[in-house]
Regions:
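Canonical tetratricopeptide repeat
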Residues: 103, 133, 167, 201-203, ...
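Single-residue signature of alpha-solenoid repeat helices
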Residues: 117, 147, 181, 383, ...
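Residue register of alpha-helical TPR repeats
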Residues: 99, 129, 163, 199, ...
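Register position in tetratricopeptide repeats
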Residues: 110, 140-141, 174-175, 206-210, ...
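Juxtamembrane extracytoplasmic segments of single-/few-pass membrane proteins
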Residues: 25-113, 270
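Residue-level recognition of tetratricopeptide repeat
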Residues: 106, 136, 170, 206, ...
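Catalytic cores of enzymes
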Residues: 634-665, 677-921
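Alpha-helical linker/edge segments of TPR/alpha-solenoid repeat scaffolds
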Residues: 204-223, 258-263, 281, 292-307, ...
Length: 921
């Protein structure tokens, strides 16, 4: 049910379509063939049928780990997508007889059915080869991020695994990371495998040549235009400008500004007219003619000084800016102001100067700069709106180079706001646009944006790949090396690899000792995990530089947080005081600045785990409760927090007894299942509680397994606002959303409601078919006291960071119920909500915060929400029906969930998924 939007599938009608599982396939399709297996084809022909070896070209470009399927033959990319070939059922039966799941999966992959291949691989024994073939299936399904993660993990264990190296190169090539792909093909070539090595050398050569040609062409144009701004005697580079009009137009304004005479400006007119023809309009030609009429006895000295600033990359002095204002040389003034972002000037000056000529390119440059200034002033919403308005205008004017740059800026701001799906989408759009135009520098900038969007989503393999490609494009540039390696150090620390993080940070410092705020953050953790004598001095120096730099409020808060965590290493009392001060200082920015929210989250996490480290377990409940915005519990509660390798859990017994446990030995990041995190001694204390309230700080909230299935427990979630005590509650209303007519393009089956008795009191309302639109559902829910969803959970990152519930489309095509939409409504009936949607509780992978549909429902006023963190089978309807009926019979939600969970684990075969159904209250 939960599905990526691009997953193949056809719409069906009626009740829930059965999920295809690997163990469904063989009994229905293969075992009949066993009856005639001994009369089948000869062994050689069997191999041809299974592995498609009877053709001169191979059917798949990636390599499988089954030796019979990994014979080299040339590969010819099909001009159009080929339909899958029928699998040989009789031959698959032979593999089934021998228990060869990997072979069955490989045959399905070769025959063009990666979904079936994945289903069989899920039941194959764990191995490196299985990981490789799972990566192949993901690659064929265009899930490159997933494929790269499988392959990188495999290659850490077996660096010379031939198939994995080959497949990694293919994935990187399809991601557009051609230099990195070429280097991996080099590794394959070095293995000396017949056929494969030669093809790998050809691939590497072709990839490098294509990148080198683009880089040389773009750099040639940039050099020609840059030199033109410094030497008025050079010829006008019309051919170079025609090849790369984006960088040419960007530099053309400086060429005009530095021209020493009217005649030289007039000589630039052919270049202006060429660029106008390409971009549309007459702005550059008009501007050139206008500047040619200026009095160059006054302008020439000012132009010469501007040329010096460009050459030396220096900001303009206040005196120079004053002289430009007095002379009325508006184009020079604008250029000097853009060279001097910290200049003190009237806030409206840039827009006033830009209005001196009718040039949308200049207007967009000014809007970009004004958005930057608004961001620094803490006006994040205004900055976002200004950039998006500029992007809209840019598209209208078809100024593609400016649009690519604005997309990258929007991506950066979205990353800063933890709108990570938007950040990735706009970053990738910038990358594609820049590649299409051959704008080398914009491509590199987009790679940085993509790397940051991936890093903040814990997508380590992709983030590392983007960073490595960025470095490969400028391997000898100090700033690039420093940037890449300090970010890789942060990635390694996210994986709890302190030695590797230290090594990356050392590489970052090879040409520049400063590693910025991110490096200071990393060093603060390394002082605990892998200390060096020089760390304290380095952190102090970085913080001094950070405090002296003009930054956004959120970045300033992050610097204060690093300072507080640094102090905490030396003195817990003083460090806690600083952390508390940081939390207070960040409060005004929490609604608008994600860096401020991250600061507060990490500050609370740090206070909690260090309290546990000090044995002050009685402090932990208050810290985590403050973080979550709920009252601190007194009894029958579990409180949990984690930060990096450290975890603290505290149990409050039925009489308020406090028992805690602190652990700092973890070597791997926590997974989605937290089973075993709470020691048995704490569980023993909690077993006598009728129900346990769990307060878990991000990133532990909304994960399964924190407590065992025999306990009645739920996650405590804060409401966004206090209920209105004087308002009369609405009458009982049972709302059911089922049989939804989702957009046909999603390929989702209709899901019927469960066969359950109606709500015992009050009215029932079912929203189904085309009537179950987001707006109608939200309106009905606002008065409901009991809500059931029988709908698909869908991952659509263009709509929400969390999974969404797929509903019927509105008139404008909107079909998704999102957590963001829930935050805008109030559920007046304090309903119990059953989310019969796959993975409705699955979390978006934020670095320090979490957000999910169930949390949004509770925040909007729901009394209790049931949801699963995994894909659930068709039988889930009966499970949720049982839970609801127990609640209507008088059980509390937590007790009802436990009772039904234990019944299913006892009586229903293959129901471990019930332990992944969580309750939020």
């Amino acid at each position: 049910m939960a599905a990526e939007l691009d997953a193949p599938g056809k719409s069906t009608r009626g009740r829930r379509a059965p999920r295809l599982r690997a163990w469904h396939l063989i009994p229905l399709l293969v075992f009949p063939a066993i009856l005639i297996a001994r009369s089948g084809p000869l062994p050689g022909r069997r191999d041809e049928l299974l592995w498609l070896t009877d053709t001169r070209t191979r059917p798949l470009e990636p390599r499988l780990s089954v030796p019979a399927a990994d014979v080299h033959r040339p590969y010819v990319r099909p001009r159009e997508e080929r339909p899958s070939i029928a699998v040989p059922l009789r031959e698959l039966a032979r593999l089934e007889e021998s228990g060869d799941r990997a072979g069955i999966a490989a045959s399905y992959l070769l025959h063009g059915d990666p979904q079936q291949g994945l289903a069989h691989l899920a039941h194959a024994p764990p191995s490196l080869n299985r990981d490789n073939d799972q990566a192949v299936a993901a690659f064929l399904l265009k899930r490159n991020d997933e494929a790269l993660t499988w392959l990188d993990g495999l290659l850490e264990t077996a660096p010379r695994h031939p198939q994995a190296l080959w497949n990694r190169a293919l994935v990187l090539r399809e991601m557009g990371l051609h230099l990195l792909a070429a280097s991996v093909f080099d590794e394959v070539a070095a293995l000396g495998e017949p056929g494969w090595s030669a093809e790998a050398r050809e691939q590497a050569s072709w990839l490098r040549a294509s990148v080198s040609q683009r880089a040389e062409s773009w750099n040639g144009t940039r050099t020609a235009l840059t030199q033109l701004a410094q030497d008025a005697n050079l010829p006008i580079p019309l051919e170079e400008a025609r090849r790369h009009p984006g960088i040419s137009r960007g530099l053309f304004y400086d060429v005009v500004r530095t021209a020493p005479t009217s005649a030289r400006v007039q000589a630039l007119l052919p270049l202006a007219e060429l660029l106008d023809r390409i971009h549309g309009g007459t702005a550059l030609a008009d501007h050139t003619r206008n500047i040619a009429t200026r009095d160059f006895t006054r302008r020439a000295p000012l132009a010469a000084e501007y040329a010096r600033l460009l050459r030396e990359r220096q900001p303009a002095s206040p005196d120079y800016l004053t002289r430009l204002r007095g002379a009325g040389e508006h184009d020079l003034l604008l250029g000097a102001r853009l060279l001097t972002p910290e200049a003190q000037s009237p806030p409206e000056e840039l827009e006033r100067v830009a209005r001196q000529w009718n040039d949308p390119w200049i207007h967009l440059l000014v809007q970009d700069e004004l958005a930057r200034q608004e961001g620094l002033a803490g006006e994040a919403w205004q900055a976002d709106q200004r950039l998006k308005a500029a992007l809209t205008l840019c598209r209208e004017k078809r100024l593609r180079p400016r649009c690519a740059d604005l997309l990258r800026k929007v991506s950066h701001r979205a990353t800063s706001a933890n709108r990570l799906s938007e950040a990735e989408d706009t970053g990738r759009a910038s990358w594609r646009e820049a590649q299409a135009m051959g704008e080398w520098e914009l491509e590199s900038a987009a790679l940085r944006a993509l790397a940051q969007a991936a890093r903040f989503q814990f997508r380590v393999a992709s983030a590392r790949a983007y960073l490595s490609e960025y470095l490969a494009r400028a391997p000898d540039t100090c700033d690039v090396k420093n940037y890449v390696h300090r970010n890789i150090a942060a990635l390694e620390l996210m994986r709890l690899r302190p030695k590797e993080a230290r090594r990356a940070l050392s590489r970052a410092q090879e040409c520049n000792p400063s590693v910025g705020l991110i490096g200071a953050w990393t060093l603060t953790d390394l002082m605990r995990l892998d200390p060096r004598p020089e760390d304290a001095e380095q952190i102090s120096a970085e913080l001094t530089r950070a405090h002296a730099t003009r930054e956004t409020p959120g970045r300033r808060m992050l610097a204060q947080l690093v300072q507080a965590r640094f102090e905490l290493l030396k003195d817990r009392k003083q460090g806690n005081a600083r952390l508390a001060a940081v939390i207070r200082q960040a409060a005004p920015y929490l609604n608008t600045d994600a860096d401020a929210r991250d600061t507060v989250a990490v500050a609370y996490q740090t206070m909690a785990v260090t309290a546990g480290e000090a044995g002050a377990f009685s402090e932990v409940p208050g810290v985590v409760a403050d973080h979550l915005g709920v009252a601190s519990p007194k009894q029958c509660a579990l409180i949990a927090a984690a930060e990096a390798e450290r975890t603290v859990v505290v149990a409050l017994g039925p009489r308020g007894q406090v028992l805690g446990h602190h652990d700092a030995s973890r070597k791997e990041p926590l997974g989605d299942d937290l089973s075993g995190l709470v020691p048995e001694k704490l569980l023993t204390l909690l077993r006598s509680c009728p129900r346990v309230e769990v307060l878990a700080a991000p990133p532990l909230d909304s994960r399964s397994g924190l407590l065992p299935p025999e306990m009645a427990w739920s996650y405590r979630v804060a409401m966004d606002a206090s209920p209105e005590p004087k308002k009369k509650p609405p009458p009982p209303l049972h709302v059911v959303v089922a049989n939804v007519e989702t957009p046909s393009g999603l390929g989702l089956a209709r899901l019927s409601s469960w066969e359950s008795t109606p709500a015992p009191i009050g009215q029932s309302m079912e929203l189904s078919g085309a009537q179950a639109t987001p707006s109608r559902v939200l309106e009905a829910m606002s008065r409901a006291t009991d809500i059931e969803f029988h709908a698909h959970g869908v991952v659509d990152r263009s709509l929400s960071e969390a999974p969404v519930i797929a509903l019927a489309p509105e008139y404008d095509g909107r079909y998704a119920l999102t957590s963001e939409a829930l935050k805008q409504v109030r559920l007046e009936g304090s309903p119990v909500v059953l989310l019969g949607a796959c993975s409705a509780a699955r979390l978006p992978p934020f670095l320090h915060q979490t957000s999910s549909l169930p949390q949004a429902f509770v925040g909007a006023g729901a009394r209790a929400v049931f949801a699963a963190t995994v894909d659930i089978p068709d039988s889930a309807g009966r499970f949720f029906q049982g839970v609801r009926e127990r609640i209507h019979a008088g059980a509390t939600p937590a007790v009802a969930l436990r009772a039904e969970r234990l019944r299913w684990l006892r009586d229903v075969k293959g129901a471990p998924w019930v332990t992944r159904v969580l309750l939020y209250e």
